Design a protein with these regions (language model features):
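A short helix-loop-beta-strand connector motif used in the catalytic cores of GNAT acetyltransferases and
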Residues: 58-72
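Acyl-donor (CoA/ACP) binding surface of acyl/acetyltransferases
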Residues: 1-35, 72-177
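Generic alpha-helical scaffold signal
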Residues: 22, 47-50, 67
């Protein structure tokens, strides 16, 4: 496995994915302060404060890039619109997660970001398998993953949602290069 350079960027038709920097925290905080976003993630707290955003960016800057890599998603002429990350849980299978600010939903941006990130993971990180999941009450995320080439595994796992404070049924998916 290669070590991921902090300067790694992914370019797609409309997006640039790059490592979060300190100035991004204000925009992340503004977008992530929406319960509709937080409740569809496993890790995002609610309410989401500026301190949470600052801490998130600081943690991203010290990630073990042999196992994990987080990107802000920038839309041309609009700046940061969301976050995408790869992380390696204890089972060892690389997992992808993402979120977009509500003004950027239903524009194909999540699909474009995930597709670009998967191409990068395959070419730069030499990954041939990536897993993902979406809460059963978030079928739109499932559609993003299907469009990016993921398939349902048939497994539904309980996953904790920090924002909800409860476990949520999660449909698991896999992408094979």
């Amino acid at each position: 496995m290669c070590v991921i350079d902090r300067s790694s960027t992914i370019q797609t038709r409309r997006l640039t994915l790059r490592a979060p920097a300190n100035p991004d925290a204000a925009r992340i905080g503004a977008l992530a302060g929406d319960y509709a976003i937080a409740k569809m993630t496993t890790r995002m707290p609610w309410p989401y404060s500026q301190g949470d955003a600052d801490g998130f960016v600081a943690r991203c800057q010290v990630q073990d890039r042999r196992r994990d890599s987080t990107f802000v998603i920038e839309l041309q002429d609009e700046g940061v619109v969301g976050v995408l990350g790869f992380f390696t849980p204890s089972d060892g299978h690389l997992e992808i997660g993402y979120w977009l600010g509500r003004p950027y939903w239903s524009r194909g941006l999540a699909t474009e970001a995930v597709q670009g990130a998967l191409a990068w993971a395959k070419s730069d990180w030499r990954k041939k398998l990536v897993v993902a999941g979406h809460f059963v009450d978030n079928p739109a995320s499932g559609q993003v993953l299907i469009k990016a080439g993921f398939l349902y595994t048939g497994v539904v796992e309980p996953k904790a949602s920090t924002a909800r404070g409860e476990t949520v049924a999660t449909r698991m998916m896999v992408w094979l290069a």
